[in-house]
Amino acid sequence: MKRFLMTIVAIASIAAVSAAEVAIIPRPLSVEKVEGTITISEKSIVVADGSLARPASIFASIVAKENGFEPIIAKSAGKSKSAIKLATDNKLGKEEYILDITRGGIIITGGSDKAVFYGLQSLRQLIFAAPHKGTKVTLDCMTIKDKPHFGYRGGMLDVCRHIFSVEEVKTYIDMLALHKANTFHWHLTEDQGWRIEIKKYPNLTKVGSMRKETVIGRAHTGDDPNKLPYDGKPHGGFFTQEQVRDIVKYATERYIEVIPEIDMPGHMVAALASYPHLGCKGGPYEVRTRWGISEEVLCAGKESTFEFVEGVLDEVLELFPSKFIHIGGDECPKKSWKACPLCQERIRKEGLKNEFELQSYFIHRVENYLKSKGRHIIGWDEILEGGISKTATIMAWRGAKQGIKAAKLGNNVIMTPNEYCYLDYCQTSNPKLYNEPVCGGGGGRRHLPLITVYSFDPYNNIDTKYHGAIKGVQGNIWTEYMPNFKHVQYMALPRMAAIAEVSWSHGNKNYESFCQRLRALRKIYDKNGYNYATFFFNGIE
């Protein structure tokens, strides 16, 4: 009830927000309104050349879909009095832009074509929120100066627990682009399914991409699998290398880098089912049909394991030009290693103290291989256990304290703590009362309402001397309880907007203002057919 009242107060006070606010999420760094208006229509020309033609084309198609008219793209404005001119200026930062709306036209200047794209996303939101008269839109004159606080602004999608189509993955990328994210973390391998074609190892998709059935409802690691209900329906599929290239190209056109995750040495049961010799026991294994953590992991004592990992990564590197490769490293039980003679021999041979250091040995070998190929690793914060190199980037999920620990050790950090950034968590404290679908976070015990996401401070009171190590923020969507993409959207939105403002507008946030602007953004969700949770809009948290 207390939170409900807080939400009502926040909504009621929206009218008091400064008149300088504009309907843009994430909140711009500065807005200066001036007198006058300009009207744009299907006769307006977007002036773009060279590398700016691509963002101009995407912008024009979006405006056509959302507003019913498509601006003309040309290399000059001609006699147009409502031209939208795009330009770059290397004096600005790579993601910094200036949006200048005057009576005589609109100019977007960015430090790069990517920055211009962000300026166009802001203009897109302004156009949709402005008064329309047929195919004519009237905009207030203003100057917006804007740039992001964090260089890494990401969204993760798990396509393993449940798989989604190419078009649905592209829609997720569109959602990220609307919110000015620049990274798509693509979780591609799991105990419950292997989702990427690796030609050297065809069984990964022939066997590992399909599970025979799926547990119904909530299930935990310690549950007796024989007493759980299952749906009896096979579930699976994978992305061909051609499809992966298509998705990477689509994201790149929207200035989003795709970072693949090949999780290791745990979360590999689908690979073990495909190639049983990779496990300590040698099988038999089957693709996991329930959630939770499996004790079966890659054998760290066999050289064939590392040959397999390197073979997989060789093909992954051909498909993804990203600077980083995510290698997981989370939730790797050590039970099988403790009982494995080969793993114990590896510990003795390498002078390791225990199985935690064996995992570090595993991660170091993979990191060194990727370094030899000119790439760097990201791993979940468990890779800190047993020691890790300073060149590894840590994705802190088990609380912000893990990120602080990594920063103090000298590692770069992406903050994605579950208590703020796990968008599979329930959105209300009483999911049964509010008819929420099955969700993560212990079925509401750790719910994550919009206001909590928005309150996240990635620096978490860390000493300012470590601020430079905190490189960004990411929202994660684990799909155990999301059998279709509409459900994914429902869990992502509108909380993705809060993540966007945390990562872009840090130090410039205002929740009352955000509430006002979110109501405008909601209409863009509606226009694009995005499914979203309405709890916030109904005053429920």
Where are these regions (language model features)?
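Flexible loop/turn segments at secondary-structure boundaries
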Residues: R54-P55, I163-S165, D191-E197, P265-A271, ...
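Soluble non-cytosolic domains of exported or imported proteins
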Residues: G50-S57, D113-F117, I163-E167, F238-E242, ...
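Bacterial Sec-dependent N-terminal signal peptides
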Residues: M1-A23
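Flexible, acidic glycine-rich loops studded with aromatic residues
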Residues: H376-E382, G387-A392, R398-E541
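Contiguous, structured surface segment used for ligand recognition
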Residues: A20-F150, H487, S503-F537
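Feature activates predominantly on carbohydrate-active enzymes
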Residues: L92-E296, A300-F306, G311-F324, R365, ...
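Active-site neighborhood of glycoside hydrolase catalytic domains
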Residues: A271-H277, K281, E286-T393, W397-G410
